[in-house]
Amino acid sequence: MLSIVYPSWIRPEIIPSFPYFRWYGFMYVVAFSIAYILFRYQVRRGELDKWSRVSEPVTQDDIMSFFTWTILGILIGARVFSTMVYEVDLLYMRKPWLIFWPFSLQTGEWVGLRGMSYHGGLIGALVGGGLWTQSHGRSFLAWADVAAASTPLGYTFGRIGNFLNAELYGRITDIPIGMIFPNVPLSDMFPASEPWVREFAQRVGIHVQEGARLVNLPRHPSQIYEAFFEGIVLWCILWCARRVKTYNGFLVCLYVVGYGVFRFFIEYFRQPDAHLGYRFSATQSSPIYLFQSWSDVSTGQILCVLMILAGLGGMFALSAYHKRDSVRKARV
């Protein structure tokens, strides 16, 4: 078989048949823990004191308080943004109390908070961190830079959580690392009667049984692509960029640009939400399950373009401010 079958022993629940403890939630804990450890490491090396506008030392309580505000901002922002941008039936607009309701409306079973948006989480983190630094008289940009260098490695585990949930998978592919994901909804399977489906299945070594109505084709494991590029690679870039930082805000702007660039291109491998489809497309009939044109642009890619523009704009503005400030101080 020229594809990989998703491991049958992987389950969303840490304890089988006990839905309250899931790998996805545990990966969030791992992600925040790694970010916290890397943040503390930089503080101990004096990297925050060096760029801070106050001489008051950073305490353990300061870091914990900052992380508490930031994490709350991430969770609230990610959930609210997801329900307001990615849900088109306006259910949460009519009944906003359901945004944080963890039970199924149909069965009453515990399902957790399904739907968390990265872009909303980023906005929430900036708001939460900004409120904390403002109320404590700290430099927001200095703290944001340290957080930016700490975040991507933890983010890696968030995407691994998506993989363990077998969600946010990519478009169909015939490359050897294509993966056949379990529990794919019927809407994401393909009619066995279609000649191209049978030909595609034969090409990847899938035997279509006689009488089968639908075929589950292999897809890009886009969660792993994102974990590697938006997590590990971006973290390496930012961790090294700490040495060439010349002004506050440089690292957080670099993070925003870097994430936007990586995510924009990986979106071409990831399948867009079926109910949203493409925001822009050269042809109105482009299927979301197959890459056909670079001009097929998803909602996530539009948000990434906005991130890139905001990050570059921030770099330009902060660099110009730093140069003017340096000239002013030199004249004093």
Swiss-Prot record:
Classification via PROSITE patterns: LGT (PS01311)
GO terms, molecular function: phosphatidylglycerol-prolipoprotein diacylglyceryl transferase activity
Physiological role: Catalyzes the transfer of the diacylglyceryl group from phosphatidylglycerol to the sulfhydryl group of the N-terminal cysteine of a prolipoprotein, the first step in the formation of mature lipoproteins.
Enzyme class, broadest EC rank: transferase
Binding site for a 1,2-diacyl-sn-glycero-3-phospho-(1'-sn-glycerol): R159
Name listed for the protein in its UniProt record: Phosphatidylglycerol--prolipoprotein diacylglyceryl transferase
Transmembrane regions listed in the UniProt entry: 18-38, 66-86, 111-131, 249-269, 302-322
Pfam families: LGT
GO biological process, one term: lipoprotein biosynthetic process
Any GO CC annotation of this UniProt entry: plasma membrane
Localization annotation: Cell inner membrane
Membrane topology: Multi-pass membrane protein
EC code: 2.5.1.145
Organism of provenance: Treponema pallidum (strain Nichols)
Family: Belongs to the Lgt family.
Predominant place of localization: membrane
Keyword set, alphabetical order: Cell inner membrane, Cell membrane, Membrane, Transferase, Transmembrane, Transmembrane helix
InterPro entries, per database record: Lgt (IPR001640)
Pathway: Protein modification; lipoprotein biosynthesis (diacylglyceryl transfer)
Keyword S-adenosyl-L-methionine among UniProt keywords: no
